[in-house]
C-alpha cells in the first residue's frame, strides 16, 4: 500500500522582543562558535565558522569568527536585541574579531568576561607535538 504524503508543517519563528541578552563565544584552535541567548540562557541564534562553509584551517581564522559573529548578531537583532553581555571561552584566534564584529553589527556591549575553564591540575594534557 502506498504511503500517504505526510508533510510536516514547519512553524514560523515568532519574534521574541528581547532587549538584552548574552553572547557566548567559544573560540578553539579549530573553530569559532557564537551563540546569542536571552538573559535566562535560551538560544536566540547561533552561528559557527564551519556552518558558514569555511573548511579545514580556514575555520580557525579571525575572519571566519568575524563572519560567524556577524551572522548570529543579525539573526538575533530580528528578535529585537539591542544590548548584550559577551562571555568568551577558549584560546582561539577569533576571540577579539568576534567581539569587534558584534559591536560593528550594531549591538551595544555592556560586559566582556573571559570564562575560559582553567584546571587546578586536572587531566594530563596531550603530549607535545614534535614536527
From Swiss-Prot:
Q: What does this protein do?
A: Located on the platform of the 30S subunit, it bridges several disparate RNA helices of the 16S rRNA. Forms part of the Shine-Dalgarno cleft in the 70S ribosome.
Gene encoding it? rpsK
Q: Which Pfam families match?
A: Ribosomal_S11 (PF00411)
Alphabetical list of NCBIfam families matching this protein: PRK05309.1, uS11_bact
Q: Which family does the UniProt entry place this protein in? A: Belongs to the universal ribosomal protein uS11 family.
PANTHER family, alphabetically? Answer: 40S RIBOSOMAL PROTEIN S14/30S RIBOSOMAL PROTEIN S11 (PTHR11759)
Q: Which organism is it from?
A: Clostridium novyi (strain NT)
Q: How does it assemble?
A: Part of the 30S ribosomal subunit. Interacts with proteins S7 and S18. Binds to IF-3.
This one is known as: Small ribosomal subunit protein uS11
Swiss-Prot/TrEMBL keywords: Ribonucleoprotein, Ribosomal protein, RNA-binding, rRNA-binding
Q: Name one GO cellular component term.
A: ribosome
Q: Which Gene3D superfamilies match?
A: Ribosomal protein S11
What GO terms are given for molecular function?
rRNA binding; structural constituent of ribosome
Q: Per the record's keyword annotation, is Ribosomal protein included, yes or no?
A: yes
